[in-house]
């Protein structure tokens, strides 16, 4: 009798054990099958800390047979750009590029002085309002670095009165070249008055043309390293953009710390190719550059981590000059081993018919281009309590 009871107990235990194993196995199998449908996507791996290898060729995509294009040849050979006698690089380029004389005038002018990256501030002490350094007690969370041109008075004033107006944690600066220009009106007295009135103009003594926008980036990075090294983020933006500052600040404050430390955020172009049609604004001759562009954020506006300023300067000293500022920035980030991050709230090819649509802008971070008049109109209507979207 006892043996029979023992057998029954043992049988029951074995049955329960088998049932437990079956349930666990079927549950695990179901979860594995269900994962692709219902599981959260894997988080994007954070950018690593910046590094700068001795040989940048592999980082910059030059792993195959070396192209005969001048930029590619220079990048393979380049150690560091000359810090003295910077005109030599351009003189050599003019002599070694066989069809240099056929290049567009703007590109020839750029190449002749492309290695020259040290320019004095245009307004000496006493002749204008020098831009104050960031104090220890007033370090901006977000620096608004707006690329402008001396004659763009209306655009600068529209920015000051709208998205560039004082907000806790932000500071506004405009980046300009010399107001002397080439054959244009003499704007020195007007720009000097503006600098004294607002104290937000960083002016350098170089020719302010589109191909020199890279200079504004590099000189800003130098200024940051000396005068505002602890800024958290820098928005580098054109003066014809519209920025939703509250939304941008909110987004930046929610970033994981690892992302924030190496941020390069905007509307990202990947696998872009040079335009080969002569006469276009972004024409690049095959004898100058071969290959695809790096992933880069559109120059209409993007955000970088402030702590990367000295790193980007080191990278720029070892990346051969390139005429387009946003593409060149992409090369420098690629040299550091850092990838850009795309955000759908950055739209830098904004259609003209939507520039007076506050509901469309309300959910975005940055749109470009927008005229000064539309910038003011948008700003006034974006914050109307009665706005129904």
From Swiss-Prot:
GO terms for molecular function: protein N-acetylglucosaminyltransferase activity. The chain crosses the membrane at residues 8-24. Residues 25-389 are lumenal. Pfam families: Galactosyl_T. Residues 36-57 are annotated as: Disordered. One of its GO terms (cellular component) is Golgi membrane. This is UDP-GlcNAc:betaGal beta-1,3-N-acetylglucosaminyltransferase 8. It comes from Mus musculus.
